[in-house]
Each structure stands twice: as C-alpha cells, then as structure tokens.
C-alpha cells in the first residue's frame, strides 16, 4: 500500500533561483537543521535551514568556488547524490551520457536525427568532498573538534573518458560493456544516483557507497563500495581488503528497480528505488541491514519498507534524508502543481514516518 506523508515541509528559495524547485535530485540533512539540496540542471548546491515545517534562508552555492570542474561556465554537474561524514559534504554527479530528446516543435526527421546524438558532459563525472562546518562550506579549514587537523576540498581526477573510477570500471565484467558501448543513462546505461558515506572503523578512511540507477542486470541493481584517500586536492581509490580491490560490487534485489538515492540510518542503509528508464512507475524504499558486515562482493536482499507515491509524469521521488526526529524527508523532481507556490519559488517535500 502506498504510504501517506504525516506532514510536509515547504522548501523556500530565493526568487532569482526559484527554478531549482522543479529539478531537485538529491538531499541531505546535516547538523539537524541544514538541508543541502542538489539540482540536476546546475553546477550548484542549495542550502536551506529547517524551522518547523519551513526550510528557508536559502543559499545558492557554486561548486566552482570549492572544486576544479572541467567546464566552469554553465555546464551542469547533474548532482545525483549528497552525503555527509566527519565534517565533509560529499557530492556525486551522474557519470552518465545523454541522448538528445525529441522536441515537440521539431519534424519527425529532425527528431530521429536528434535521437541518434549522444553527449558527454565532463562535469557530470564529479565525485568530491567539501569541508563543512556549521552549515558553511570551505576549500580548506581546521577541523573544529581538533584544530591540528586540516580539512581540504578534494575530488577524483577527471580523465578524457570521465574520471579514474570510470577508467577502472571499463575493465569490469558486468559494467565494462555498458561503458565501452557508450550507452546513455536513461537507456539502462551507467548512471549514478545516490551516495552514502560511513566512517571506516578499520583505518579511519571513509567508506563510500554509490548507487547505480542503471544498468540493472536481470533485475539486480548494483551498489558500488569505495574507499577514497586524499592527496592534497586529489582523491584516489584506495585498495581494500586482503584482495586489494579498488572497489566492491554488490548486487541488490530491488524487484527490478534501479537505485535512485541512498541514506544511512545507523549501521543500515536506506535505498530509494525506482525505474531505470524514463517512465512513471513504482517508487519503493528498502532497508539494507548491517552495512558494516559487507566484506566481499555480495548478492543482497534488503527489506521493503515503504511504497512512495508518484504521479504520471510528475512527483518523481529523487532524494531522501533522515530528519532529526527520525522521520524520512522525500524531495521530488518534476513536482506536481499542488506542491508549488504561486510565485514558483517554493515547493513542498513529504515527510514519512519510519516504523521502528
């Protein structure tokens, strides 16, 4: 049965940037009051502050103020995941190719030609961390709990084919064929949606989990596990475990759906799941238990938790985060008109109760 939200929170944006309300793609609550939001049509982050059922005091923040993007003009990053751990905000782009859309005002011949055109936008291959202290971002700063520790913004190195992660994955027996064939994300190609960060108890490095919207292989979604270490402003893939692998690959039974977002809940992992292709269909929340005990590549069967409401062509759930009261906040891409205020500068997000 589809869940019913127990309340809603209105996200309010500056009028100059009110457009972001229609393309929200990621969310993370930090320090119990700051909501960090991603918009998949920009190279920015949005920050609002929660007070009751309102989240306002909007800040529109350019990622180029903290990171070195290949194209620093107006090219989108396609932010698809935001995570937080140990005073770092983590941001990931979709890492996907784009196929041109058909246009209503174009001829059949023009649209057929458009559907043959693929685009690689280099900014989409962003995987980065930015120091975060009391709701503010920094390129470099002292760790507030231990001033002798320096926090630095860092990112995975960009490459001609994307970045160092894509370079490694091109040799993967499951993912390599999709990457080498240049299959766009919305065609069940490689497409990142969701990131979760956990402090590593073994060596102090942060464990990063990355969700793939696609490809889904015979009904199995894929969850990548990485460890990253910083060398100045560069992030590098750390070899993990006795086998010294640069990533782990977990196959997750989400009933044929792909991963749309990730959110830590203690030692567990919440997974928002939805269609891989561009269609309106079931959106479900799953819970993967005891993430700490994942050591090797695995087949995983998480518990189904909620059915999230969706519309036909609107209200596409894209981001989830836990609120201080333990409830789940859900933000939507292409929100329905009943969610948006008359000035087109605010949008309603849903809050769902999670049963213990």
Task: Outline where the language-model segments fall.
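Sequence/structural signature of beta-propeller domains
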Residues: 1-356
């Amino acid at each position: 049965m589809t869940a019913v939200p127990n309340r809603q929170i209105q996200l309010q944006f500056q009028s100059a940037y009110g457009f972001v309300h229609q393309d929200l793609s990621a969310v993370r609550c930090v320090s119990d009051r700051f909501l960090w939001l991603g918009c998949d049509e920009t190279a920015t982050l949005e920050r609002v502050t929660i007070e009751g059922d309102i989240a306002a005091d909007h800040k529109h923040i350019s990622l180029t103020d903290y990171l070195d993007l290949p194209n620093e003009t107006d090219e989108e990053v396609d932010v698809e995941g935001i995570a937080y751990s140990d005073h770092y905000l983590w941001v990931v782009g979709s890492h996907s190719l784009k196929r041109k859309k058909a246009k209503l005002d174009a001829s059949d011949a023009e649209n057929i030609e458009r559907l043959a055109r693929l685009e690689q936008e280099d900014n989409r291959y962003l995987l980065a961390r930015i120091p975060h202290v009391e709701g503010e971002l920094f390129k470099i700063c002292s760790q507030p709990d231990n001033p002798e520790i320096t926090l630095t913004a860092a990112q995975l190195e960009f490459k001609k084919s994307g970045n160092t992660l894509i370079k490694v994955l091109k040799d993967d027996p499951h993912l390599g064929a999709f990457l080498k064939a240049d299959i766009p994300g919305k065609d069940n190609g490689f497409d990142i949606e969701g990131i979760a960060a956990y402090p590593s108890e073994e060596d102090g490095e942060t464990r990063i989990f990355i969700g793939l919207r696609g490809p889904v292989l015979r009904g199995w979604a894929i969850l990548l596990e990485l460890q990253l270490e910083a060398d100045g402003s560069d992030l590098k893939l750390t070899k993990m475990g006795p086998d010294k692998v640069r990533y782990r690959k977990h196959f997750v039974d989400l009933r044929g759906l792909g991963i749309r977002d990730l959110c830590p809940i203690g030692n567990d992992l919440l997974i928002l799941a939805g269609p891989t292709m561009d269609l309106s269909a079931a959106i479900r929340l799953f819970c993967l238990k005891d993430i700490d005990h994942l050591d090797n590549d695995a087949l995983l069967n998480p518990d189904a938790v909620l059915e999230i409401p969706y519309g036909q062509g609107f209200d596409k759930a894209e981001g989830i985060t836990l609120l201080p009261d333990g409830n789940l906040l859900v933000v939507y891409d292409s929100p329905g008109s009943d969610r948006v205020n008359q000035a087109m500068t605010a949008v309603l997000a849903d809050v769902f109760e999670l049963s213990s």
